[in-house]
Every structure is written in structure tokens, then in C-alpha cells.
């Protein structure tokens, strides 16, 4: 539908890379990132993150894709700049830290004011409208992402929906950019105002957090009364209104998105009477307390933590639920050792990192893991996990 466009992705994390590679099948894409190591890997057709499809596409597909640390080179000729920088939740202000997004917007406005900026970073409700008014510009479109870490490119190739936070001809053209690189056909597309698009992202993730919290609470109840959690979940989820998905018990919801998005939604609507959303946050804390108490009932001298990552197939442990378990166990004076091959150094959270898996298994009285692995099959009698379905 288009000629070849020049598209820059700012931020080479899983959101930026999955969008950049999607579009590099048909257009000229430059990935901008401040980390030279990431840029060097990408220019060598290697992925800096763990994502099977990203690794495969970089190494085997014909892509018009390169990376740079030079923002002037990245932005100066771009038709579109996709902003995918991190917006961590700031507990002090009860808001997302949007400074990285704002910095990109200012840089692009200075270097290439004609570029259309597409914000993929998760932002507070009302952010896009406010910054457009504040800077006196109109070339910003918010389009939320619904990607899983470790499967980000797959989710862009097979999207559940495409949401564009603007109702205009240029919004329709943007939707086509996301569609033309996808494998899935007949993708639902919804055009909304920017504020509604921002709310869609936060409410979607908050619902997922609620679902995780519900099945975790079901599991806590079942474990407390000696019931078979799996049988209960199977029976509940045969109801098509409930569905057999996102129902595997865990140590709590975690990862990069669900904790911060739920808290941001609470902050956005703190003036609105609510019980459910605040209860989700409380339920997640309660789950971690429950898991910790179950572990401590075994009276271990040494608790071994197998992997910090939140999901299998991911290389990220930001806000992983097991971190909260570690803190609680250590507060009780119990020694914790950790096996996490992704971390360099000798300690994490002031707990020793054990490099050799066999030695780790031998030292631990009980091994806890959020998600099971075949590596633990030989010591399954001392493993504690609530992973019933072997999925995320």
C-alpha cells in the first residue's frame, strides 16, 4: 500500500524490537538505543533479549534493519518514530516515570518536527493529550502494545487486536503498517481517542492481574484445606464464560507490566470509589505472605531459589513475584541461596549466587521455583512450586 517508509524505533527492548522487526520486513527501520552493546549485537544480527521469534527473524529473514546510538542519525529522516522506552512506576509520586518518553518527544521535535511519533510505552491516562497541549504539537499518536515478554514478536505477528488512539486518515495508515507485517489476517482494529486507548491498556492488564490473583487465591484456599487445586480449576474453567487460560497458579503476578499498570490505574482513578482494583493489589501481597508461610512451615535451614525470571523463556526478572518471597524469607532469618545463570557476580539481594546447579541442589533443604523445569526432576521431592499446568 505504501512505498518504503523510514521508521525509527526508540528503545531496543522487547516492545521496540518486536515492532521494529515487524516493520523491517517492508520498510527501512533504524533502532535507536543508548546501550552500545545492544546496538552492536543487533548490527551483527543477534538479539540482545531472549525471544525465539526475534532471534529467528534477525538471523534468517531479509530485513531492512540496523541500529545506532546516534539520535540525530536515527531521527533526522524518519517518517515515523515509534517510542518504546521504559516507564517505570514511581512509588513516590504514584505515577509512571514518563521522562524517557518526554525526552524522545523533545528530541524528535527538535531534530525532525515532521515525523509522526507513535507512543508504544505505557503511560498514564491522559498523557498524550496533555503533552500535545503542553508542547503545542499534534504529531503524536498513542497505540498500546499487548505483548508477552519472550513472545513479543510472535504477538505482533499474531495480534489479538490493534488499537490506535486517534480517529483520522493517518491513524488508518498507521494501522496498515502494523497489519502488513503480520502473519494473522483479519486482525480486529479499533480507533479511539488517545485517552481511551491509554485506559484500554491499563484496564486490560489490570483484568489479567485480577485473573491471576483469583486463581492464586483459589489455590491458597485449596492448599489450606487439602483440596486438589487442579481438579477445581479444570472444573471451573470448562465454563466457556470463564475459559481455560491464564489460570495457572503462581507465587503472585509480577513481571514488568502487571504490577505497575495496576498501581497506575489506581492512581489515575483515586477519586473514583473502588474496591475491586485495590483488592487486586492487596491480594497479590496476601498470596506472597501465604506462600512464604507454607515454605517456612518446612523449617528449612537453607532455601534454594531456582531462577528469578517471571516466565519461562524470558530473560527478565523485573518485579518478579519470587523477589517478594525472597525478602519475606530473609526477614525471618532463613538463609537463601539463588541459582540464576543470567546474573553475574557472587550475590543478589545479599544472598549467595550458586553457579553449579548440582551444588545448589545439594545445599538447599527446600527449592522454590515459580515455574517448574526439567532440570529439577531429580530433586522433585524437595521442590515447592504451584506450577500445575507447566505454562505461564
Swiss-Prot record:
Pfam families the UniProt entry points to: UDPG_MGDP_dh (PF00984), UDPG_MGDP_dh_C (PF03720), UDPG_MGDP_dh_N (PF03721)
InterPro entries in UniProt: 6-PGluconate_DH-like_C_sf, 6PGD_dom2, NAD(P)-bd_dom_sf, UDP-Glc/GDP-Man, UDP-Glc/GDP-Man_DH_C, UDP-Glc/GDP-Man_DH_C_sf, UDP-Glc/GDP-Man_DH_dimer, UDP-Glc/GDP-Man_DH_N
Entry superkingdom: Bacteria
Molecular function terms from GO: NAD binding; UDP-glucose 6-dehydrogenase activity
Family: Belongs to the UDP-glucose/GDP-mannose dehydrogenase family.
Alphabetized PANTHER family for the sequence: UDP-GLUCOSE 6-DEHYDROGENASE (PTHR43750:SF2), UDP-GLUCOSE 6-DEHYDROGENASE TUAD (PTHR43750)
Post-translational modification: Phosphorylated on a tyrosine residue. It results in a significant increase of the dehydrogenase activity.
Broadest EC class assigned to this enzyme: oxidoreductase
Swiss-Prot/TrEMBL keywords: Capsule biogenesis/degradation, NAD, Oxidoreductase, Phosphoprotein
Record's function text: Catalyzes the formation of UDP-glucuronic acid which is required for K5 capsule synthesis.
Catalytic activity: UDP-alpha-D-glucose + 2 NAD(+) + H2O = UDP-alpha-D-glucuronate + 2 NADH + 3 H(+)
Catalytic activity, EC: 1.1.1.22
Biological process per Gene Ontology, one example term: capsule polysaccharide biosynthetic process
Pathways per UniProt: Nucleotide-sugar biosynthesis; UDP-alpha-D-glucuronate biosynthesis; UDP-alpha-D-glucuronate from UDP-alpha-D-glucose: step 1/1; Capsule biogenesis; capsule polysaccharide biosynthesis
Sites where the protein binds substrate: 145-149, 201, 205, 246-250, 254, 311
Native source species: Escherichia coli
This protein's name: UDP-glucose 6-dehydrogenase
Binding residues for NAD(+): 6-23, 33, 38, 87, 122, 149, 256, 260, 318
Amino acid at each position: 500500500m505504501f512505498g518504503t517508509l523510514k521508521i525509527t524505533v526508540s528503545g531496543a527492548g522487547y516492545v521496540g524490537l518486536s515492532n521494529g522487526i515487524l516493520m523491517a520486513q517492508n520498510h527501512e527501520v533504524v533502532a535507536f538505543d543508548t546501550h552500545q552493546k545492544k546496538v552492536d549485537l543487533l548490527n551483527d544480527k543477534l538479539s540482545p533479549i531472549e525471544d525465539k521469534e526475534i532471534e529467528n527473524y534477525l538471523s534468517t529473514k531479509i530485513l531492512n534493519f540496523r541500529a545506532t546510538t546516534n539520535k540525530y542519525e536515527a531521527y533526522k529522516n524518519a517518517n515515523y518514530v515509534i517510542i518504546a522506552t521504559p516507564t517505570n512506576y514511581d512509588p513516590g509520586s504514584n505515577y509512571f516515570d514518563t521522562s524517557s518518553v518526554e525526552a524522545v518527544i523533545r528530541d524528535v521535535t527538535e531534530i525532525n518536527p515532521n515525523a509522526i511519533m507513535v507512543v508504544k510505552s505505557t503511560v498514564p491516562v491522559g498523557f498524550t493529550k496533555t503533552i500535545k497541549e503542553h508542547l503545542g504539537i499534534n504529531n503524536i499518536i498513542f497505540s498500546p502494545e499487548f505483548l508477552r515478554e519472550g513472545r513479543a514478536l510472535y504477538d505482533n505477528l499474531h495480534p489479538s487486536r490493534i488499537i490506535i488512539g486517534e480517529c483520522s486518515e493517518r491513524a488508518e495508515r498507521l494501522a496498515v503498517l502494523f497489519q502488513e507485517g503480520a502473519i494473522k489476517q483479519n486482525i480486529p482494529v479499533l480507533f479511539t481517542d488517545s485517552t481511551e486507548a491509554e485506559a484500554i491498556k491499563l484496564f486490560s492488564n489490570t483484568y489479567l492481574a485480577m485473573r491471576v490473583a483469583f486463581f492464586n487465591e483459589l489455590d491458597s484456599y485449596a492448599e489450606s484445606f487439602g483440596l486438589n487445586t487442579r481438579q477445581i480449576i479444570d472444573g471451573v474453567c470448562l465454563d466457556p464464560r470463564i475459559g481455560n487460560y491464564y489460570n495457572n497458579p503462581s507465587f503472585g503476578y509480577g513481571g514488568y507490566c502487571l504490577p505497575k499498570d495496576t498501581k497506575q490505574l489506581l492512581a489515575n482513578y483515586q477519586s473514583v470509589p473502588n474496591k475491586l482494583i485495590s483488592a487486586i493489589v492487596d491480594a497479590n501481597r496476601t498470596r506472597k505472605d501465604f506462600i512464604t508461610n507454607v515454605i517456612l512451615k518446612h523449617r528449612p535451614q537453607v532455601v534454594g531459589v531456582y531462577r528469578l525470571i517471571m516466565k519461562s523463556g524470558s530473560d527478565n526478572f523485573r518485579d518478579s513475584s519470587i523477589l517478594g518471597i525472597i525478602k519475606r524469607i530473609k526477614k525471618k532469618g532463613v538463609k537463601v541461596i539463588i541459582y540464576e545463570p543470567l546474573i553475574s557476580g557472587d550475590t543478589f539481594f545479599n544472598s549467595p549466587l550458586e553457579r553449579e546447579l548440582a551444588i545448589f541442589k545439594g545445599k538447599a533443604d527446600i527449592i522454590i521455583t515459580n515455574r517448574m523445569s526439567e532440570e529439577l526432576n531429580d530433586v522433585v521431592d524437595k521442590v515447592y512450586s504451584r506450577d500445575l499446568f507447566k505454562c505461564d
